[in-house]
């Protein structure tokens, strides 16, 4: 028996091999804008880069792009990406309609524990909110919603659901054997659908009416639903798909129908057209409805109208509903949804960049809301609609585009004021030292803009923002991980002696091979 000789060979990883530079292209202003926003999402500290450093960063990220620093500046100015002047920003908060609180109070308070109640908000345009009726301790459970208004299967799992590889209700991947599935009655007799548990099968009340052509419900047409569902899936139209499932659920059981309709009508509403016209991103790195993966069309009307036509064909009872009402349903879903579901009680929580509540959603779509810190009696319960680790510009942009308001919470106000002070201080330093050539002071850029911030003062505003944002209330690591879809670890300000050595990976690997 021969023994193979081994030698050590160093190879380059496949994904690190240098690629040939692409053909130079001139990006559109929309592409530049959305890549700036994407950069802020990936690296929040980049929000405070001055113009030259930001330009360098953009060129490194997009080696085949040909554009000059003036183009970048024009994009930042025209899209108010660095503006902290509220008068320059469009919002649609004044167009959002809130049902009278007297019409919804009994619906909400009947479902809330005695420690929480709904009230009208004193602040203009906030509508309604949830308030503590007594002191609440940190970590205390505030309220629990066992199910959303109507459970909506995840649209991104529809292909797997149709093939029986994911649960027809919750979308979880299935690993049970066929014998186990059949033994426990978790398979469907009329199609390939399978459920992960008896609980999911019982909750999937719309399945036989939407998926089986033999349905006896005259208000639901499964064949048309199949076309509607595929249209939504192909166009990542989550809102329309969700509205369809919710409406189907309301048609199946009379008692449940009344509750679903009452809860849905109690939610704040706005036309999707108004939201679209106020947005300014195509979502390739943008922010408009990005949480549920939506793409923004240049002209969404054909997409909306086709969805509407298929919707009223699927549900004959909606024939008199009207196209504009359908758009209101879409807008209502977007401004109230949480993780692609409509939770009735949670929808009454208002936003703050320093929230005092947090939530947990398990794989069965049960929602629990806890006190993130001590809450005083009569204090409003507030959640965060956006990633709290993002910078003030990106947070306010996401809130303005998706929920229609410009946030002026204490945290935003402090960070904006800090930017203004730094901008003025550095501007004076630059002017006094006659080094204005390094600073962009074009008339379109207000001195309150971080574009005017240079690193000549020995420290970046990102350092100041990071230290000041939630200094006194900054949660620990576990808290930061809760309710955030993204998470960035900051480099420590100082390295202690006991700090363990980091493992560094490069783009080569050594391996033993046979000679």
UniProtKB/Swiss-Prot annotation:
Reactions catalysed, as given in the entry: L-lysyl-[histone] + S-adenosyl-L-methionine = N(6)-methyl-L-lysyl-[histone] + S-adenosyl-L-homocysteine + H(+)
Disordered, as annotated region: 452-476
Enzymatic class: transferase
An MF annotation (GO) of this entry: histone H4K20 methyltransferase activity
Gene Ontology annotations of biological process type: methylation; negative regulation of gene expression, epigenetic; telomere maintenance
InterPro entries: SET_dom (IPR001214), SET_dom_sf (IPR046341)
Cellular compartments annotated: Nucleus; Chromosome; Cytoplasm
Protein's job: Histone methyltransferase that monomethylates 'Lys-5', 'Lys-8' and 'Lys-12' of histone H4 (H4K5me1, H4K8me1 and H4K12me1, respectively), thereby controlling gene expression and remodeling chromatin structures.
Protein name: Histone-lysine N-methyltransferase SET5
Organism per entry: Candida glabrata (strain ATCC 2001 / BCRC 20586 / JCM 3761 / NBRC 0622 / NRRL Y-65 / CBS 138)
